[in-house]
């Protein structure tokens, strides 16, 4: 089987979380509570938050949405976050990104209490991750790691290329895969918009993790036979044959590379579903740490 089925693995993780919640109920322990902070009325952000709320319902979590008008000031938003920090009923919360112009994202994420930072973006948690200390991992990299574990992918000594250096995916996954852990020990290269000879680097890589958001950028002639492809990108491209007028694709030209790879994540249905399930797994851990 060539497909790394993120939807299947995500469902397995959610079922495990649901069972853990049921066991907590039997022990009269607190039900995990995840909150989301949403600023403005950005359509995709609203969709992402709604999907997280539905996932909470599925596993038996409590959930809350704190939605604010895009006119909110940075200081006002910080004040609201500090209220959530001291709300003992909420185990973890996320600040949905991106934030509107005029609000400094770094300042906001710095204000999220580390023990409630289930997105793993607070500098304290980010630093722990870099040092290999157990903490909340950013959800998308955590999802990639979970797929690597469940598909028994051995990266020891393998050449792994990460394309993209964002704080959300590229940087953290490059750090994690280089660590001396069961899922790591890879020889990691990070490529980005200023990298030269990208095709040559790709052809020399045993695994490629692409997180650049350029539709179908990775072609068949850029990968070596038997490589593993983790496609984090998700884009809409025009498709007159679709009822919606578009189709969803990733960074990788799936059809052209399929016969050449050993394993590949599809888009949709690959990394995407894992992000929400790992966010909930972090929230379960946050709740357990409060017992």
For the regions a language model picked out, list residue spans one by one.
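Positively charged, low-complexity intrinsically disordered leader regions
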Residues: 1-28
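Short, well-structured alpha-helical segments in soluble
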Residues: 76-88
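Short beta-strand elements in bilobed, periplasmic/extracellular small-molecule ligand-binding domains
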Residues: 56-70, 184-190
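Rossmann-fold NAD(P)-binding glycine/threonine-rich loop
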Residues: 105-122, 126, 230-290
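Glycine-rich, N-terminal phosphate-binding loop of Rossmann-like dinucleotide-binding domains
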Residues: 97, 212, 232-233
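Glycine-rich phosphate/diphosphate-binding loop of Rossmann-like nucleotide-binding domains
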Residues: 39-53, 135-228, 237, 244-255
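Short beta-strand segments enriched in small/hydrophobic residues
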Residues: 31-40
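Anion-binding alpha/beta catalytic cores of soluble intermediary-metabolism enzymes, centered on
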Residues: 95-160, 201
């Amino acid at each position: 089987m060539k497909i790394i089925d993120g939807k299947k693995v995500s469902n397995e993780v959610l079922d495990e979380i649901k069972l853990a919640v049921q066991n907590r109920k039997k022990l009269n322990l607190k039900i995990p509570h995840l909150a989301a902070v949403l600023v403005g009325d950005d359509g995709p952000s609203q969709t992402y938050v709604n999907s997280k709320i539905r996932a909470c319902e599925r596993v038996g979590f409590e959930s809350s949405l704190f939605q604010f008008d895009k006119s909110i000031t940075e200081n006002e938003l910080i004040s609201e976050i500090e209220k959530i920090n001291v709300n003992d009923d909420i185990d973890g919360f996320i600040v949905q990104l991106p934030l509107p112009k005029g609000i400094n994202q770094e300042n906001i994420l710095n204000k999220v209490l580390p023990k409630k930072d289930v997105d793993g973006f607070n500098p304290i948690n980010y630093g722990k991750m870099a040092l290999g200390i157990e903490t909340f991992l950013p959800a998308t990299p955590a999802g990639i790691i979970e797929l690597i574990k469940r598909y028994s992918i051995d990266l020891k000594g393998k050449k792994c290329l990460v394309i993209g250096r964002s704080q959300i995916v590229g940087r953290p996954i490059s750090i994690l895969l280089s660590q001396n852990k069961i899922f790591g020990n890879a020889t990691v290269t990070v490529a980005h918009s200023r990298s030269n000879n990208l095709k040559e680097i790709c052809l020399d890589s045993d695994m490629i993790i692409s997180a650049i958001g350029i539709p179908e950028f990775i072609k068949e002639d850029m990968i070596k036979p038997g490589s593993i492809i983790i496609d984090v990108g998700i884009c809409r491209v025009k498709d007159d044959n679709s009822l919606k007028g578009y189709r969803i694709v990733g960074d990788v030209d799936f059809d052209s590379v399929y016969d050449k790879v050993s394993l590949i994540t599809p888009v949709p249905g690959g990394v995407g579903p894992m992000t929400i399930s790992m966010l909930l797994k972090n929230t379960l851990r946050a709740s357990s740490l409060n017992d």
